[in-house]
């Protein structure tokens, strides 16, 4: 009785089961249902949506090991491979060339991966579609095969972007958040080193801070404890091995930063992990090497790329990207901090979309008592603004804002106009996150030919008097910012420079009406030095003493200057007199090392037409004998050069001029006027309390000689001519470059045939104080991407020597400004 139903049940199972499921795939999902032999998988079937997984660059299909041989046979037949290439080893290499991959899973099954750019992948509407077939065992005809449709939507969100912020204490990574194609999203989890998995709410237990909105995810990690140290191609990098995971998907947040350092090197390194930045399959690690096809650095055209199977390393000269900003140490001490921002565009052969990788790296904050971080790097900045002294500014000078950022290149004005104080974002602040630094737009420079940065300076340190001794009390110096035009071609010297001090954002240069400068300090022939500077083209307004940059972009950039022996005396500039017309202004971008220095004891060469003798003079105030004639001012006329106003003044376009690092410069220009300058007339303030120096005899005059077209060398010393005051000990060594080709329309009436006249000079400096020269300061600033080396060699240069004693006669007399001739 009991055996009959059991036997009947067994017979029924034996007869029915083989005919119901003859050629079906075994699916892992409980919701998947196998189909009968008479049926094939079509788009209407519910199986393809569960078995096909879609990612950013590819789609995958799980293949049981019992069916992988049928897939191989179909692929070999479709790709028309010969019989000898149908073995598994040869087949896999052939499949890779077409964008197909068969990966062995840990359980013995296979994962079939198809790139969206693979062979036979079709684009229909907003989907990628591929039809494949799997042959049944022992059958080669398509009539006995199973058909599968692999179909994935095109992702609209661009996931090939990553922004990395490398701070001294933490690393911050920001990436676009993937958008799901359906509502079946599972919560995102954090995976560290592929092992530790935590929810976003528990990320703080790992020391991580997460800010996630609808479009962006930002993660901040401390440097201590979570980073892995890597040695990559003889360089060091610290890697954050962090991923976002959800279901079968993984999303990389990996980022690499250089080790923390106080001082930049001559080049900056960017380490980019070789990985897919989009959604990838979570789980088994697939050995894959990406092939770099294209790379571009937006801030520089000079870079070097090396790579291995894990990283792409980009080396960029620091001169093109390094910048400096103000900072505060832990104790509140003000200092400076070097940083750089680099934007790179990359293309890998295996990725459908390009990659945009942005790195911001900040060095340690350096206080006033330590070495400047910018002293050993080629800063992409122009000379720094004047520093009021070694520790404290003079009375009446307001401290500079701590948020002032020094930038150079095309992004300089944008840096100056933005508030770059580091402040936490609102979203991070609500979650108790650490500092969330704002980033600036990259300085995108134009395409130029790549060249090796010239190295032309080898500085030697000499004794120098304490800074600030030559300063004149009671005359506060306005703040200053220096020009955004980069300079190029200076190599840092091995000596340790003095600390960087805060400076101020405006520079006022009072001058007299004649080209003059005070006598330089004592000669130091045993310390030759040349400093190549390339700067913006500057207009010299003769008679008015106004210096402003050229407004015509078609004009050539300023000629480099070879400057020697420039003093660093502390001469303050007076404030403009109320009611006077505004003066022309010029914005300068500073370097990381501000100096309290002036051109009050420097030599300037007044260029005249090629047919006339050249005049050299020293001092800051010059009185000429009365001259008559149209366009010439009356006796004793003086001008004022002010860089704090934007109102134009009468000018005569002349040679390009570069101002050396951060000096309260006192310039003088010959007393001339262009015809009809009524619209631009302006007068400067009257200076009081300034001692004056007079010379009893005119100085020697040397003709201008052209420089040979060869690399720049230290200024050579010519045969000295004894001065009438002081004898041979006060001989002046002067070498001047060829004069600029100036036409009559450029110099106007400045170049006349009148002979040079005896001049009376005065020096704005206390009696008995020896002003230090630039040779003694020996500050090796390095320049950014300015004019090319070929341009610098073909443009005229000016070599100045400061190897003569100061005149002994000092008189405490002050002359007021005389009125200009009426029209």
UniProtKB/Swiss-Prot annotation:
Composition bias (Low complexity) maps to: 389-402
Q: Does the keyword section mention Signal?
A: yes
List, alphabetically, the InterPro entries matched.
C1orf127-like, DUF4556
**GO annotation, cellular component aspect:** extracellular region
Residues annotated as region Disordered?
Answer: 206-242, 269-422, 434-520, 632-656
Q: Where is the composition biased (Pro residues)?
A: 216-230
Disease involvement: Heterotaxy, visceral, 14, autosomal: A form of visceral heterotaxy, a complex disorder due to disruption of the normal left-right asymmetry of the thoracoabdominal organs. Visceral heterotaxy or situs ambiguus results in randomization of the placement of visceral organs, including the heart, lungs, liver, spleen, and stomach. The organs are oriented randomly with respect to the left-right axis and with respect to one another. It can be associated with a variety of congenital defects including cardiac malformations. HTX14 inheritance is autosomal recessive.
Q: What is this protein called?
A: Ciliated left-right organizer ZP-N domains-containing protein
Pfam families this protein is in? DUF4556
Q: Which GO terms describe its biological process?
A: establishment of left/right asymmetry
Signal peptide start-end: 1-22
Q: Which UniProt keywords apply?
A: Disease variant, Heterotaxy, Secreted, Signal
Answer whether the UniProt record assigns the keyword NAD to this protein: no
Per the entry, what this protein does is: Plays a role in left-right patterning process.
Tell me where it resides. Answer: Secreted
Main subcellular location = secreted
């Amino acid at each position: 009785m009991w055996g009959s139903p059991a036997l009947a049940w067994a017979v029924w199972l034996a007869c029915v089961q083989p005919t119901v499921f003859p050629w079906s795939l075994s699916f892992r999902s409980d919701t998947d249902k196998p189909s009968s032999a008479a049926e094939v998988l079509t788009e209407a079937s519910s199986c393809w949506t569960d078995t096909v997984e879609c990612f950013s660059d590819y789609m995958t299909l799980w293949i049981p090991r019992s069916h992988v041989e049928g897939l191989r046979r179909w692929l070999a037949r479709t790709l028309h491979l010969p019989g000898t290439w149908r073995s598994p080893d040869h087949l896999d290499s052939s499949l890779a060339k077409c964008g197909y991959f068969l990966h062995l899973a840990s359980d013995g099954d296979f994962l079939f991966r198809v790139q969206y750019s693979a062979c036979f992948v079709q684009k229909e509407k907003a989907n990628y579609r591929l039809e494949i077939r799997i042959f049944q065992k022992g059958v080669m005809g398509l009539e006995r095969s199973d058909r599968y449709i692999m179909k994935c939507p095109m992702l609209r969100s661009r996931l090939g972007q990553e922004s990395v912020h490398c701070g001294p204490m933490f690393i911050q990574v920001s990436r676009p958040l993937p958008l799901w194609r359906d509502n079946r999203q599972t919560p995102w989890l954090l995976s560290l080193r592929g092992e530790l998995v935590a929810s976003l709410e528990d990320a703080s237990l790992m020391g991580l801070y997460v800010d996630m909105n609808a479009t962006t995810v930002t993660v901040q990690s401390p440097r201590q404890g979570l980073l892995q140290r890597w040695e990559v191609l003889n360089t060091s990098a610290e890697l954050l091995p962090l991923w976002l995971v959800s279901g079968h998907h993984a999303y990389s947040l990996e980022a690499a930063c250089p080790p923390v350092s106080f001082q930049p090197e001559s080049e900056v390194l960017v380490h980019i992990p070789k990985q897919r930045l989009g959604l990838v399959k979570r789980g088994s690690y697939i050995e894959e090497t990406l092939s770099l096809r294209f790379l571009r650095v937006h801030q520089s055209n000079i870079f070097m790329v090396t790579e291995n199977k894990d990283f792409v390393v980009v080396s960029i000269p620091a001169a093109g990207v390094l910048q400096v900003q103000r900072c505060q140490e832990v104790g509140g001490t003000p200092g400076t901090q070097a940083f750089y921002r680099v934007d790179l565009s990359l293309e890998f052969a295996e990725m459908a979309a390009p990659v945009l990788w942005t790195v911001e790296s900040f060095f340690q904050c350096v206080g006033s008592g330590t070495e400047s971080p910018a002293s050993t790097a080629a800063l992409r900045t122009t000379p720094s603004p004047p520093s009021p002294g070694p520790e404290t500014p003079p009375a009446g000078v307001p401290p500079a804002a701590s948020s002032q950022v020094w930038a150079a290149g095309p992004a300089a004005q944008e840096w100056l106009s933005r508030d770059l104080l580091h402040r936490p974002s609102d979203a991070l602040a609500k979650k108790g996150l650490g500092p969330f630094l704002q980033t600036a737009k990259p300085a995108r420079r134009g395409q130029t030919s790549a060249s090796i940065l010239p190295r032309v300076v080898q500085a030697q340190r000499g004794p120098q008097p304490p800074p600030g001794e030559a300063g004149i009390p009671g005359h506060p110096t306005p703040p200053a910012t220096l020009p955004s035009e980069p300079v190029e071609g200076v190599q840092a010297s091995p000596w340790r420079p003095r600390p960087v001090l805060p400076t101020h954002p405006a520079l006022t240069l009072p001058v007299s009406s004649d080209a003059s400068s005070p006598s330089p300090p004592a000669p130091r022939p045993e310390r030759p030095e040349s400093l190549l500077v390339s700067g913006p083209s500057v207009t010299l307004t003769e008679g008015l003493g106004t210096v402003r940059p050229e407004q015509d972009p078609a004009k050539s950039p300023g000629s480099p200057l070879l400057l020697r022996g420039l003093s660093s005396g502390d001469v303050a500039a007076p404030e403009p007199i109320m009611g006077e017309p505004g003066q022309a202004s010029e914005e300068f971008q500073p370097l990381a090392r501000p100096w309290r220095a002036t051109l009050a004891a420097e030599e300037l060469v007044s260029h005249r037409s090629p047919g006339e003798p050249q005049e050299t003079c020293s001092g800051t105030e010059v009185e000429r004998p009365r001259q008559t004639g149209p366009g010439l001012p009356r006796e004793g006329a003086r001008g004022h050069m002010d860089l704090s106003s934007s109102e134009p003044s009468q000018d005569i376009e002349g040679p390009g001029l570069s101002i050396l690092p951060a000096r309260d410069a006192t310039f003088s220009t010959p007393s001339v006027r262009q015809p009809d300058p009524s619209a631009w007339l302006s007068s400067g303030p009257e200076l009081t309390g300034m001692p004056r120096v007079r010379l009893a005899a005119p100085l020697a005059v040397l003709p201008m000689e052209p420089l040979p077209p060869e690399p720049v060398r230290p200024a050579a010393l010519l045969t000295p001519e004894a001065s009438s005051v002081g004898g041979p000990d006060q001989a002046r060594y002067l070498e001047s470059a060829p004069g600029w080709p100036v036409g009559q329309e450029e110099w106007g009436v400045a170049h006349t045939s009148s002979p040079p006249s005896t001049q009376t000079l005065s020096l704005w400096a206390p009696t008995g104080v020896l002003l230090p020269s630039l040779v003694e300061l020996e500050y090796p600033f390095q320049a950014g991407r300015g004019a090319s080396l070929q341009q610098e060699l073909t443009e005229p240069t000016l070599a100045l020597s400061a190897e003569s004693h100061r005149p002994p006669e000092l008189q405490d007399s002050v002359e007021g400004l005389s009125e200009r001739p009426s029209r």
